[in-house]
């Protein structure tokens, strides 16, 4: 990973397999929702949304390695985007991820609003709409996006890698900036 690298987000298919304890506590124990409750924002029942299969990115990641210079992958699981991405960022570098580059699926907003869950807690527990990150050489970003589009993966550039000194000596390895797009 080098300063200037592009951070590419690949959309999640929903909650994936993380955060169900929080979701259960908020939506069932707290808000009293039933699995068969129709949620207009979902266009289906809560149960159908929660049973959405987790997207598996292995073949997509392998395809990326054949078409562009990939420096790292980060699977966004428990711990959220910032904590998982931080695991691949070397000392001396920093990743900035701009929330304004995507809109989380309605299920994430429902968990937040129904349970008055703060954004920081949601981001530490849920993927917030990003299931996988690829860190690629900047000159390969367009090719990476084209490869993912050809494979039917919704993907976008969500950030970049900089020298940690540019972000402040005591900056975290990853900073989430801005507000989510609506």
From Swiss-Prot:
Alphabetic keyword roster: ATP-binding, Cytoplasm, Ligase, Nucleotide-binding, Purine biosynthesis
InterPro entries membership: PurM-like_C_dom, PurM-like_C_sf, PurM_cligase
Enzyme Commission designation: 6.3.3.1
Keyword Cytoplasm appears in the UniProt entry: yes
A GO term, aspect molecular function: ATP binding
GO biological process: 'de novo' IMP biosynthetic process; adenine biosynthetic process
Organism domain of life: Bacteria
Subcellular location: Cytoplasm
Disulfide bridge positions per record: none
One GO CC term on file: cytosol
UniProt pathway annotation: Purine metabolism; IMP biosynthesis via de novo pathway; 5-amino-1-(5-phospho-D-ribosyl)imidazole from N(2)-formyl-N(1)-(5-phospho-D-ribosyl)glycinamide: step 2/2
Keyword match ATP-binding: yes
Catalytic function, reaction form: 2-formamido-N(1)-(5-O-phospho-beta-D-ribosyl)acetamidine + ATP = 5-amino-1-(5-phospho-beta-D-ribosyl)imidazole + ADP + phosphate + H(+)
Similarity comment text for this entry: Belongs to the AIR synthase family.
Name of the featured protein: Putative phosphoribosylformylglycinamidine cyclo-ligase
Taxonomic source organism: Streptomyces fradiae (Streptomyces roseoflavus)
């Amino acid at each position: 990973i080098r300063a200037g690298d592009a951070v590419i987000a690949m959309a999640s298919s929903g909650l994936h397999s993380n955060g169900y304890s929080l979701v259960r506590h908020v939506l069932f124990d707290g808000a009293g929702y039933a699995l068969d409750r129709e949620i207009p924002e979902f266009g289906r029942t809560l149960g159908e949304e929660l049973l959405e299969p987790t997207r598996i990115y292995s073949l997509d990641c392998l395809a990326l390695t054949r078409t562009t210079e990939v420096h790292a992958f980060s699977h966004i699981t428990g711990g959220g985007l910032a904590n998982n991405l931080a695991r691949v960022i070397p000392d001396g570098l920093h990743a900035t991820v701009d929330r304004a580059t995507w809109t989380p699926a309605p299920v994430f907003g429902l968990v937040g609003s129904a349970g008055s869950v703060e954004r920081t807690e949601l981001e530490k527990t849920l993927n917030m709409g990003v299931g996988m990150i690829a860190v690629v050489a900047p000159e390969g970003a367009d090719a990476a996006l084209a490869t993912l589009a050809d494979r039917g993966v919704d993907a976008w550039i969500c950030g970049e890698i900089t020298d940690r000194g540019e972000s402040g000596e005591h900056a975290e390895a990853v900073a989430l900036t801005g507000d989510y797009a609506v």
